[in-house]
Amino acid sequence: MTDTSPRTEPADWATDQEVRWCPGCGDYSILTAMRMLMPELDVDRENTVFISGIGCAARFPYYMNTYGMHGIHGRAPAIATGLAMARPDLDIWVIGGDGDMMSIGGNHLIHALRRNVNIKILLFNNMIYGLTKGQFSPTSEVGKVTKSSPMGSLDSPFNPISVALGAEASFVARTHDMDRQHMMDMFRRAHEHKGAAIVEVFQNCNVFNDGAWEGITKKQNRDANLITLEHGQPIRFGADDEFGVVVDGGAAKVVSVADVGVDALLVHDEHKPDPSTAFMLSRLARGPFEPTPIGVFRATERIEYASSSTSQLAMAHDNQGSGDLAALLRSRGTWQV
């Protein structure tokens, strides 16, 4: 009889490092979900890498018994890109918060996504700067009163899902820290995807922005405001599936199913090459108090970056032969500048 049990246990993926997040932080549940998922993926710790930037979320590599790098602010996607190019055999995860990824790291993030580098990005979004003690972040709502905006923030927030879709990311998903199984499902889907995958995680900072997502994630609010996307299914939600989503006038809108009928509802297609419909879904909610989709927004196939680069180098080698650096240095060609 074949033994199909996992080769590792969740405890094998834990380290001896003391976890230094605040008690009650949503990061704990994300860490637990990841540790529980790893044995199910049946991957080797020696071939798994977690790379982070700066911030509360960035301590994640210390707590996973794998290779890892605690990088510099915003640069985790760039570091991960280099590693993915040099070692395409590795499982590479990138961890960062909304401040780290959407502010100083914004350019690195969108270029890693558009290039389709084979890395898996988890963006912990708590709509606040936590490590620096409570300033408004690029995802904070307009009017947010913080230490750095005592009269309220004037900045319109980024929507990470919209940004990712605008960068033509081939895999885009969203989950939240109150549902461990859903987190594991989204992380698993990201891992299975060949190319750049980003998962936004609604995460609670109970010290500096407590309850930011409770309008969506709190148990008594989920029926009214949490829309779970399922490929091939009409988009419905509510305690009795009494609400649905339609496309009207170029925008996604919430309707009563009794008013329009089931046949009028938008059927979710995560494999649709054009990201327009997924983008409309990402704009459905104007803030963390309205019906908000979670799940996989987009999962399309295109060649990942390292494969493209390898093919290009092979073509150059076939057409021009192997390079000779020593011969180049000894050549008589000179340039004046």
Segment roles from a protein language model:
Residues 9, 89, 137-190:
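Conserved thiamine diphosphate
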Residues 1-7, 16-17, 207-337:
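Flexible, low-complexity linker and terminal segments
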Residues 170-226:
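ATP/pyrophosphate-binding catalytic subdomain of soluble kinases
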Residues 106-113, 131-144, 163:
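Active-site-proximal loop->helix
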Residues 54-56, 126-128, 179, 202-207, ...:
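Glycine-rich beta-alpha junction loops
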Residues 7, 11-72:
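Active-site diphosphate/adenylate-binding microenvironment
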Residues 52-130, 184:
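Thiamine diphosphate
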Residues 17, 44-48, 76, 86-92, ...:
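Short coil/turn connectors at secondary-structure junctions
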